Design a protein with these regions (language model features):
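Ribokinase/PfkB-type carbohydrate-kinase core domain
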Residues: 1-131, 146, 150-165
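Conserved single-residue anchors adjacent to enzymatic active/cofactor-binding motifs
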Residues: 135
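4′-phosphopantetheine-dependent carrier domains
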Residues: 142-143
Length: 165
């Protein structure tokens, strides 16, 4: 990432951010994890080059339940890498690039989500305080329970909370 900042008065604002994706296997760190002790394997791929094809293959070969979510960016979709995973979480735009149709949870922001042909309404948020991270909260709640409605509720609670980094 390269960020460019602008100062106006006493405040500094992010003016521009340029993200680069590097999927070269040779530049990725060696991931040496014994996956046999885990019940499920969940990947949140933020497209920084750490989730490489050999690790995706290792996850599939572990014989565990697998989940994948990938960061939306201006780069072409990388969901093709996760077609063989048991569950995929993506937004509507990304869902159009996926041939797999079962066990795909499509997030729709304030419009809720859909999974396996069922729509799940979002929970009303009167005073959104912090929307950054709502998708991560949704994904964590979905992983914990497998319930898209519960995940929507937790994401709404998060948006209304005052969470500071």
């Amino acid at each position: 990432k390269t960020r460019y900042w602008v100062t106006h008065g006493d405040a500094t604002y992010k003016y521009l951010q340029i993200n680069r994706v590097n999927d070269e296997e040779s530049l990725a760190p060696v991931i040496d994890i014994d996956l046999s002790s885990y019940d499920i394997i969940a990947i949140a791929d933020y497209r920084c080059g750490f989730v490489i094809d050999s690790f995706v293959k290792q996850c599939l070969e572990a014989g565990k339940i697998t989940y994948a979510s990938s960061q939306v960016s201006s780069h072409p979709s990388n969901y093709y890498r996760y077609e063989d995973f048991d569950y995929i979480v993506c937004n509507e735009r990304e869902s159009k690039t996926i041939s797999k149709k079962d066990n795909v949870c499509i997030t729709k922001g304030s419009d809720g989500c859909s999974m396996n042909g069922m729509d799940y309404a979002s929970y009303k948020v009167d005073n959104p305080v912090n929307i950054i991270g709502a998708g991560d909260c949704f994904y964590a709640a979905l992983l914990a329970t497998g319930d898209p409605d519960f995940a929507n509720m937790k994401a709404a609670e998060y948006v209304e909370s005052e969470v500071y980094e």
